[in-house]
Amino acid sequence: GEPITITLSSSDLKRLATNEATSLSKMGFDSSDTFQMLLTLDRQFMAGIAYYSGILKLGASVVRNGPGGIVNQWKSIDKIRPTVLIAVPSFISKLIKYAEENEIDYKNSSVKSIVCIGEPIHNADFSQNILAKRITEKWGVRLCSTYASTEMATAFYQCGKNKGCHNNDDLLFTEILNDFGNPVSHGETGEIVITTLGV
């Protein structure tokens, strides 16, 4: 079908910035960090503008490098010296492969953490999946997981315990309901129902 277009007001953008700044802070990042974004702000990609706005609200530095361009990404890492990358994890595997093939000392780069978007990095039991292991076994960086959707205009974020993602209670109310609309008991399967707040 046709993609849905969701327009954003200035209030919506402020809400996105608040969500991402709070999420990044809870992940352990602060104004001393420098972020390199390996994702787009174009083509109505809400995550791009959300992360960018949130990083600015956090008071950190940011370079918007866009997706792709492996050579350019490594040049930017060498020149800007970011502490955090925001990227799709499968692209990080390509960065590592290129670095190894071109004798780039990526293990001693400035990058300490990667905020992973768009693909899972954990199994159902919260252990690292194959993709995450492939990255961390080669590059000793900390991986942080996020999950978001345009419709809820909010992201779930992973704290340092790596036992699942959290939401910002001021912006989102999350329920897991059965077929009759009642909350399920712990461990039961249900439908996730999201109520956005402040939209």
Region locations from a protein language model:
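Active-site phosphate/ATP/adenylate-binding loop shared across adenylate-forming ligases
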Residues: G1-K138, C144, K161-K163
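Conserved AMP-binding/adenylate-forming
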Residues: F126-V199
